[in-house]
Amino acid sequence: MLRIAIQAKGRLSEESLALLREAGIEVDDTKRKFLSRSSSFPVEILYLRDDDIPQAVEQGVADLGIVGYNEVCERGGNVKVVDRLGFGACRISLAIPKAEDYPGLDYFNGKRIATSYPNILRGFLEKNGVSARINVIAGSVEIAPTVGMSDAIFDIVSSGGTLVSNGLKEVEKVVFSEAVLISGGNLSDEKTKLLEQIKFRFNAVRDSRGKKYLLMNIPDDRIEDAIQIVPAMRSPTVLPLAQSGWSSLHSVVDESVL
């Protein structure tokens, strides 16, 4: 049995559970517990804080984790990304007061930057030869310049609305993040097989999004005409019907063409 760590609450938690269910992995979270077991697939779900998930996977407390790539970059240690899941998109960016001119990265020399991601920020600054003071803040990073705690911030940005409401502007996009599936890399053969099954199911869910199953009954003498105009992922399936001279045409098509 595999143990998968996911975020205990929040949008990423709900989207992770939705993906698991779409992949046929049913999890009862009506009485959200620390640990729950799937009724349809040999996995346990471990609910943790998002910043604890990489460490839990690295230490073998969980076999896999679903977490934002930003957390892997900040705290990942010895874990590897085995699948990108296509939801929870955001970025980690540098932002400054909107009234300030921004000439480039030299702006940050000698400045105080508030962040919850000191490791990522430190690496970025060192790579670009910038000398700044990093102030680590656990939450509400965006208010730091307003209250005089910093000159700039380095924080998660989704739509940018929070920055605008706090009088800030985004000037450098450093890390692009989304939900990823991570592994510690020390899985048994049995667990590796389960991981491959999960990845196959997740991929099938992604491929099916935006698709519709199209079925039509058609006279046999019009099959070739229909095949020419019906879009398909590959080639439509044609099956004979009980009524002579008629067939059933099946195809998977993009929802946008219907």
Can you say where each PLM-predicted feature lies in the sequence?
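Small-molecule-sensing regulatory modules
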Residues: 1-42, 69-80, 85-91, 98-258
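Short glycine- and Lys/Arg-enriched binding-loop motifs that mark or flank ligand-binding interfaces
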Residues: 56, 61-64, 106, 163
